[in-house]
Amino acid sequence: MQKARIKLSSTQHTELDGVCNQIKAIAEKTGVDMAGPIPLPTKALKVTTRKSTDGEGSSSFDRWTMRVHKRVIDIEADERTMKHIMKVRIPDTVQIEIELRN
């Protein structure tokens, strides 16, 4: 039987966990084997910009940080389960990637 690896990433960890819980509920309902959700390390993207645009005055900076949270779920990819997963409502802030493996 084929396996599906579902990779999820988002800047909002609460919405990401909500989608993971929906996929977990589908796996329990259909009775397929599932591993995960496995949390991967959070990537912190940092940008530092200078507040003063003209270059005069004291050097003061703004620091911006965006955290990207990731999860991986391995699940048996039978047709019924995959149809249910495709119907899950996914928020705009969550990116999903499904890869089928033998």
From Swiss-Prot:
Q: What does this protein do?
A: Involved in the binding of tRNA to the ribosomes.
- Family label: Belongs to the universal ribosomal protein uS10 family.
What gene makes this protein? rps10
Which InterPro entries does this entry report, sorted A to Z?
Ribosomal_uS10 (IPR001848), Ribosomal_uS10_CS (IPR018268), Ribosomal_uS10_dom (IPR027486), Ribosomal_uS10_dom_sf (IPR036838), Ribosomal_uS10_euk/arc (IPR005729)
List GO BP terms, alphabetically.
translation
Q: Which SMART domains match?
A: Ribosomal_S10
Source organism superkingdom: Archaea
Pfam families recorded for this chain?
Ribosomal_S10
| Keywords from the named record | Ribonucleoprotein, Ribosomal protein
Quote the PROSITE patterns the UniProt record gives: RIBOSOMAL_S10
- What GO cellular component is one of the record's annotations? small ribosomal subunit
Q: How does it assemble?
A: Part of the 30S ribosomal subunit.
The record's section on NCBIfam families has: uS10_euk_arch (TIGR01046)
According to its UniProt entry, this protein's organism is: Methanococcus maripaludis (strain C5 / ATCC BAA-1333)
What GO molecular functions are on record for this protein? structural constituent of ribosome; tRNA binding
Q: Give the protein's recorded name.
A: Small ribosomal subunit protein uS10
